[in-house]
């Protein structure tokens, strides 16, 4: 089993953690002007990929 030889310093751990970030969801605008999440159904019209769901 892999065990660290030395303790990881606070600075080194913080530098590694800088890459742990969340991305904001990017909604898309439909043809009727409403906003929805990509690959999701439009909740106002009930359509998904131009077909009624």
From Swiss-Prot:
It holds the Pfam family Ribosomal_L32p. Residues 1-20 have a biased composition (Basic residues). Residues 42-53 have a biased composition (Polar residues). One of its GO terms (molecular function) is structural constituent of ribosome. InterPro entries: Ribosomal_bL32, Ribosomal_bL32_bact, Ribosomal_zn-bd. The keyword Ribosomal protein applies. Keywords: Ribonucleoprotein, Ribosomal protein. Belongs to the bacterial ribosomal protein bL32 family. This is Large ribosomal subunit protein bL32. It comes from Sulfurovum sp. (strain NBC37-1).
């Amino acid at each position: 089993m892999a065990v660290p030889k030395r303790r990881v310093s606070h600075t080194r751990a913080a530098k590694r953690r800088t890459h742990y970030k969340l991305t904001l969801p990017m909604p898309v605008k439909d043809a009727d002007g409403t906003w929805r999440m990509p690959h999701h159904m439009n909740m106002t019209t009930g359509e998904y990929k131009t077909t009624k769901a």
